[in-house]
Amino acid sequence: MSVTPTANSTEEAANITASPRLWPYTEPASAIIILVVSLIILLTIVGNVLVIVAVLTSRALRAPQNLFLVSLACADILVATLVIPFSLANEIMGYWYFGSTWCAFYLALDVLFCTSSIVHLCAISLDRYWSVTKAVRYNLKRTPRRIKCMIAVVWLISAVISFPPLIMTKHDEKECLINDETWYILSSCAVSFFAPGLIMITVYCKIYRVAKQRSSTVFVAKNGLERQPSQSETCFVRKDKFEKESPSSNSSESAQRQEELDDIDLEESAASDSRARGSRFSKRRRVEGERRGPQRSCRVSWAAHQEPGSRQQQLASKSKVAQMREKRFTFVLAVVMGVFVLCWFPFFFTYSLQAVCGERCGPPEALFKLFFWIGYCNSSVNPIIYTIFNRDFRKAFKKVVCWSAQRT
């Protein structure tokens, strides 16, 4: 969001025609700022284009929910092309050069893209939550068309929040500042950042709680502890082949049981790959602990007896891979959301603080500008996060880069 508050900004704007304007930075400082921001713009565009191409061309990334990442990458590219260059010019020159009409649209686009980023992250967190808590039912509805409709709603909400207040505000020819009235600053910060951020954090805490609950169920199954599982807890165990009991030591039986339980999934087996739905036949089996009496049962779904290489085994394997991808993406997106909040929170907090108590409790102007540019830097970090934390993205990026190099 473009805000450059200065104590004497109005007075300076009035004196533009009276005396030649001096740029606020020396030539070496201006050159360094231009170089750094240009690198940020380049990194943002190249990185997010790679994300879009990777999702659209890689089989491992072609799940419908990854369309959210494509839309988020588009928002970051638009920030780099339609917002940051004009913010850079305004920063270096010390005044707005591009007229009042473009100022209104520039501010609206700035708020739009920032708001859309966090609303995208909200939608992603809700998508993850539903996929974990209502796996079978939600995944039947999780089609590309439905995801595209959700993305359209995200952009519509962002536009409704961003455009009307800014387009209706009059702007000076030589100064492009966002509405500085207290009511607008507080309401825009609440709607554009704090409320969506609170929703996002709350939903991910619930996802963590569900995952922890299911992890404890697995621990119970592996250790044979007495515990009555809740209705939502199911231990899913895959076993390729049931073996007949043979005379063996207790330790070998324990090892075998432990090996069987090592493949327990924390998510429902239909969570990510609906094509594997009819491939499992479930039966109830008690999980008994060593050296214990009768135990309470935990409902365990066993794969049917499968010959190696059978279609059922292949489908089960695909489902296992899909589930692991789903878990990895959930972790990666948690990192993305955390970094987004860390990048933008200092700006929104100090911006709101200034609205409440004015200059006396606000940070120094240089620090406020730093917070403002750190927020813009967030547009370039998502591709880096995907590369560091997700193997599927790393492979897809390498493939795209190698393919581009071969063509040239």
Curated annotation (Swiss-Prot):
Keywords: Cell membrane, Disulfide bond, G-protein coupled receptor, Glycoprotein, Membrane, Receptor, Transducer, Transmembrane, Transmembrane helix. Residues 1-30, 94-103, 171-181, 357-369 are extracellular. Pfam families: 7tm_1. Glycans are attached at residues 8, 15. Residues 260-270 have a biased composition (Acidic residues). It is found in: Cell membrane. This is Alpha-2Da adrenergic receptor. It comes from Danio rerio (Zebrafish).
